[in-house]
Amino acid sequence: MLIEEIEFYNVNGKKTTTVVPENTKIKKRVLNDRRTLYVGNLPKNCRKQDLRDLFEPNYGKITINMLKKKPLKKPLKRFAFIEFQEGVNLKKVKEKMNGKIFMNEKIVIENILTKEEKSFEKNQKSNKKTAPDLKPLSTNTLYVKNIPMKSTNEDLAKIFGVDPKNINFVRRELVDLRTNKVFFSDEFHTGEAFIKFDNLGTGDSIQKKCREFKGRKASNGRVLLVKIASAKKNEQKQEGGDNTKIKQN
């Protein structure tokens, strides 16, 4: 059976350890947000008794939940959640003790989050992870991928029914081996292009055009991947990446 070592602090403020089986559930103590303050930037040699000596003479008996955090490649950070007795005005404690020099360190005192605030913060983080990265879309341009490498402006113009000058290929970036200079090819593209539609009528739209050309095939039978382009002036950066360039015709 796998085991893990858990750190605790005894009644004298000294660190002790115990060994518990893996997957053993350790009941977490629920903090009362109306009676608890966060105390941060504690000295590395701070112990529970030091905190009792700091707070109890003025605010009565306290309960200390000492924790420590050690970010990678950063100094050890020590902080604690201190729970006061009923009737203690946390606002006054914070006003008096926040920024106080304690064992040569300037401590930071903050209120802890309420259940509602924790729930809201958790939902916000979850939404940021799951929400799609919505971007404004163009009203007259399609972005097309999977284009045969030998395709020309005229080839795509024939498929999409636009003027060849409205076809902008994303050009390949090449390196001149003699000079090591980077340049953009006039001959080779990346298989991507922007198709601009002029004067879309009231009964037409770029969304309709996108649906119309979904699944359309090139002359060699390859299926073109079509979507609405992002509404950015420099669409090359949006769709083509850093190593490409749109060839303006």
Curated annotation (Swiss-Prot):
GO MF terms held by the record: mRNA binding; RNA binding
Family matches, as SUPFAM superfamilies: RNA-binding domain, RBD (SSF54928)
GO biological process, one term: ribosome biogenesis
Domain RRM intervals: 35-114, 140-231
Record CDD domains: RRM_SF
Gene3D superfamilies per UniProt: 3.30.70.330
Keyword annotations from UniProtKB, A to Z: Repeat, RNA-binding
Listed GO CC annotations: cytoplasm; nucleus; ribonucleoprotein complex
Matches recorded under PANTHER family: RIBONUCLEOPROTEIN 1-RELATED, RNA RECOGNITION MOTIF RRM DOMAIN CONTAINING PROTEIN
Protein name: Ribonucleoprotein 1
Source species: Saccharomyces cerevisiae (strain ATCC 204508 / S288c)
